């Protein structure tokens, strides 16, 4: 079990392992190692830079970057000098970037490239901002070149008594970071997390995961997301190795090259893997895959218990099908983790029948972030696992999950009233999620704020229905709507590569995506998908109308949060005319 008093203690362990490889980065097609002492030297170099800038204990220092080795170096350096890290998503607009920099009162700001630097230039005045550092080479007005700073790091790799003493000055209850929640509406709120919040959650959330020294993981989820950062800390704390991948599009090649033991992703990535696997299976290959899935289903209980079935048929299916899926993850993975949004029972069962237990967890930024998780020591499909021991949990009268403990955040930055609203009178944090506990395993039903109440007074939980729809390879995203209406409808953003393959096989031609979704054959196909899902729903939950949209929903186009959750209000506003058509208005 990890036992650190602060994140600085974690870094002290990370930085004193000599020549041991702790991180990897890609240059061209080659993956290069970063040793413990190299990381130590680089963090020292940035810490000295921050001190030369006059950054004091408690000052806020912001950071925006893709996943590259500079990210943890800056993060650990900020913590080393007792400052507070403020990570920003790369997808923020200049206006959003400016809001967070002003709201946090950032004194310094690190950006990765000219694109983010240009956003800063367009973000408006930030009165507190005094210094900017840029990772990439180039000419940037009034900014420090970080490559020049890192050149000095080689001379700082040996343990330094004064620097190590500086690390120890930070106390557990000091603020470590302010994480601005992406949110689906309004201005983001800054979640204040202390060192104690983070290290206590690390200590208990990783117990049962059996992370080993030398275990590798590819860091590709945005590190401004609390879960991605949490796992990186956990791997560093257990003497593992992190390979930083700046571009998600390069993930397939990275998995083959790095061969990670640990794979963390949001549900959408798992859905994409499933859709890609099913999309390649035609004719005899599909027959074999269906047979293998049948064998997996027959031996599901054994796989759930972490056993390898002894059946000759299962072993044959493993050789022909399951092993190839595992090879797509690099062939060495032994732990698959899903978080950030619900994975859905259908996807969980599909992977299980392919011989893979996906450990689904649950949490939020405000809980540092893990509330519960499945592990090798406790796994139940369809749940988000058992609670971390440093959190208590209770259910409100309406089923809302409420938690209390050392992982719960210190409050929202400069928003005392907003903080009060998130807690009960007796001090329990209201998660906003509906759930239930069964033999210690937590299940999430839906987001309280997303529950749909029809005009007939019936409640519909949209997420489970959306999960069932997305289990079909032709569905990219789905938004179930119907609040205050007589019945529920669904807007579907197709999985366009799969749809185009289907169209070619079924004699459908169209000049563009908009024309494709308006084709009668295509619409009939999606109506049949919805009809199949409707058969598993209560009468009041059934989707009466289907609307197809002619574009993919993405983070960049604004319909999804960085953790791939639907921005429902954005979708409702963007497609209000189409929704009116569905309701015959």
Residue ranges and their predicted role:
Residues 452, 477-479, 527-585:
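Conserved C-terminal "lid"/linker of ANL adenylate-forming enzymes
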Residues 33-37, 176-202:
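Conserved AMP-binding A3 loop
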Residues 387-454, 471:
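Conserved ATP-binding/catalytic segment of the ANL
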Residues 23-76, 93-98, 150, 195:
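Conserved AMP-binding/adenylate-forming core of the ANL superfamily
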Residues 199-216, 223-322, 332, 357:
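Conserved AMP-binding/adenylation subdomain of ANL enzymes
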Residues 2, 52-53, 80-152, 525-532:
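Structural core segment of the AMP-binding/adenylate-forming
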Residues 117-172, 277-324:
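ANL superfamily adenylate-forming
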Residues 19-21, 134, 155-180, 187, ...:
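Conserved pre-ATP/AMP-binding loop-to-beta segment of ANL
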């Amino acid at each position: 079990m990890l036992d650190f008093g602060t994140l600085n203690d974690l870094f002290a362990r990370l930085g004193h392992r000599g020549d041991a490889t702790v991180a990897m980065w890609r240059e061209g097609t080659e993956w290069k190692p970063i040793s413990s002492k190299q990381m130590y030297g680089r963090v020292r170099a940035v810490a000295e830079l921050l001190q030369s800038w006059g950054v004091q204990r408690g000052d806020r220092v912001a950071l925006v970057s893709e996943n590259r080795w500079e990210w943890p170096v800056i993060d650990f350096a900020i913590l080393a000098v007792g400052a507070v890290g403020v990570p920003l998503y790369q997808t923020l607009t200049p206006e959003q970037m400016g809001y967070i920099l002003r709201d946090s009162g950032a004194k310094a700001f690190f950006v990765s490239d000219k694109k983010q630097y240009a956003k800063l230039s367009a973000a408006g005045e930030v009165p507190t901002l005094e210094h900017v550092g840029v990772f990439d080479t180039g000419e940037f007005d009034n900014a420090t070149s970080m490559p020049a700073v890192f050149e000095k790091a080689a001379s700082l790799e040996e343990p330094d008594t004064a620097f190590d003493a500086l690390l120890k000055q930070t106390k557990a209850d000091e603020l470590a970071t302010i994480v601005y929640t992406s949110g689906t509406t309004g201005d983001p709120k800054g979640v204040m997390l202390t060192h104690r919040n983070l290290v206590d959650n690390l200590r208990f959330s990783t117990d049962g995961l059996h992370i080993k020294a030398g275990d590798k993981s590819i860091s590709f989820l945005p590190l401004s997301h609390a879960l991605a950062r949490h796992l990186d800390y956990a791997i560093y704390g257990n003497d593992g190795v992190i390979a930083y991948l700046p571009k998600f599009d390069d993930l397939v090649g990275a998995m083959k090259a790095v061969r990670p033991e640990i794979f963390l992703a949001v549900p959408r990535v798992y859905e994409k893997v499933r859709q890609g696997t099913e999309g390649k299976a035609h004719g005899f290959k599909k027959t074999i895959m269906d047979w293998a899935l049948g064998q997996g289903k027959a031996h599901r209980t054994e796989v759930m218990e972490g056993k390898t079935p002894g059946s000759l048929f299962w072993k044959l299916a493993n050789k022909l099908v399951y092993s190839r899926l595992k090879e797509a993850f690099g062939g060495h993975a032994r732990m698959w983790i899903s978080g950030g949004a619900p994975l859905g029972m259908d996807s969980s069962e599909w992977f299980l029948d392919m011989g893979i237990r996906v450990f689904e967890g649950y949490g939020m930024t405000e809980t540092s972030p893990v509330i519960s998780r499945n592990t090798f020591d406790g796994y139940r499909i369809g749940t988000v696992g058992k609670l971390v021991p440093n959190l208590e949990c209770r259910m409100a009268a309406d089923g809302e999950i409420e938690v209390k403990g050392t992982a719960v955040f210190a409050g929202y930055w400069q928003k005392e009233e907003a903080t009060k609203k998130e807690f009960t009178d007796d001090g329990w944090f209201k998660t906003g999620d509906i759930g239930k506990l069964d033999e210690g395993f937590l299940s999430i039903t839906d987001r309280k704020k997303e529950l749909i109440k029809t005009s007939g007074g019936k409640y519909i939980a949209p997420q489970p229905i959306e999960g069932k729809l997305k289990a079909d390879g032709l569905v990219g995203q789905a938004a179930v709507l119907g609040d205050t209406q007589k019945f529920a409808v669904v807007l579907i953003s197709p999985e366009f590569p799969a749809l185009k393959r289907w169209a070619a096989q079924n004699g459908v031609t169209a000049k563009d995506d908009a024309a494709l979704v308006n084709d009668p054959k295509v619409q009939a196909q999606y109506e049949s998908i919805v009809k199949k899902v409707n058969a598993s729903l209560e009468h009041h939950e059934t989707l009466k109308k289907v609307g197809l949209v002619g574009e993919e929903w993405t983070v960049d186009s604004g319909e999804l949060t960085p953790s791939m959750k639907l921005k429902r209000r954005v979708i409702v506003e963007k497609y209000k005319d189409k929704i009116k058509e569905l309701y015959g208005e």
